[in-house]
Amino acid sequence: MTRKEVKVQLNLTRFFMLLLLVPGVPGAAAAAMQTSEPFVGVQLERIVTSEPRPEIIHLAIVDPKAAGIRFLVTPSNGDPNGAQPGDPNLETTRETTLQFITRRHARLGINGSFFTFVKHSLDTNNVSLVISDGHVVSPLDPRRAWVFNITPDNHAQIRKVTASEVGEPDSQLHDAIAGSDLLVKRGKVVAPTGSKFDDSHPPRTAVAVTRDGRLLLMTVDGRQSGFSEGMSLQEVARFLVAHGAVDALNLDGGGSTTMAIADPHPRIINFPSDHKPDGEAGEPRAVGVNFGVFARPNPDYQPLPPIRTAASH
């Protein structure tokens, strides 16, 4: 669909204060932010910017210490192909983030790890470490050793993992997803630059941890000219630092980038970039791994108003 207008209620104060702290954050010249609290311990922000290019960003801020909060990474598919000779032993079965939160009865979800496409199959292997509920789903690739992890006692962390730690009870690896690049380390932007992947502006999904232990789940839409045009890794990192990140990791992006919510009816709240059969953007992608948040409903919740587009009229 052609997106010609975005109508939002303005709530600029907090966002501009953050921009003053971290120069170069996209949206410094024109930004609008909406905030809601759909669940106990979960705050949801939608930020619409026009500089240096149009962006629509969704940020979920999760307090792992809040009552009722728990997490889940996509588990193994149980090797549905069996142990016959030549069996590819694929690790997970792809599904959209919306399908994942619906089937698992989670309240919020984002896409997770990079994965391989297998022709004529929804079964897939994932790139580097995936752990679900303490069970190793995908082995560690030392070239992608930075992971996002939820410990057994619900602490969020971003850490570098060694092969000897995987499968060890003392490692505290419980629900873990490997990413591609470390974006923020100890509050400093460390995102790489120089390659096409680093500096281009696709949709992005990222995760971060704040100094007080909160979890930041971020999506920025892209590949939709004039509506939302994506971010470089450096821009994502600066945005997350502006929101208090001390450590941050890049996850799978592009057409995989999705955030879904069940408030209470499951729905996708961002704008995926893959094309529908009619050629327009908005088709959710089935991915190898998703990350889900379980939480208690907030009785005082007021949903964010929908983003209006030309197709809404």
Segments from the language model and where they lie:
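Short, solvent-exposed aromatic-acidic interface loops
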Residues: 74-81, 162-167, 220-225
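Conserved, well-ordered active-site substructure
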Residues: 119-141, 192-246, 256-312
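Short, conserved active-site entrance elements at the starts or edges of catalytic domains
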Residues: 172-194
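Bacterial N-terminal signal peptides that target proteins for export
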Residues: 4-16
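Zymogen propeptides
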Residues: 29-141, 146, 155-157, 306
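Bacterial N-terminal signal peptides
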Residues: 14-27
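Broad, structure-driven detector of short, well-ordered beta-strand segments within folded domains
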Residues: 146-152, 207
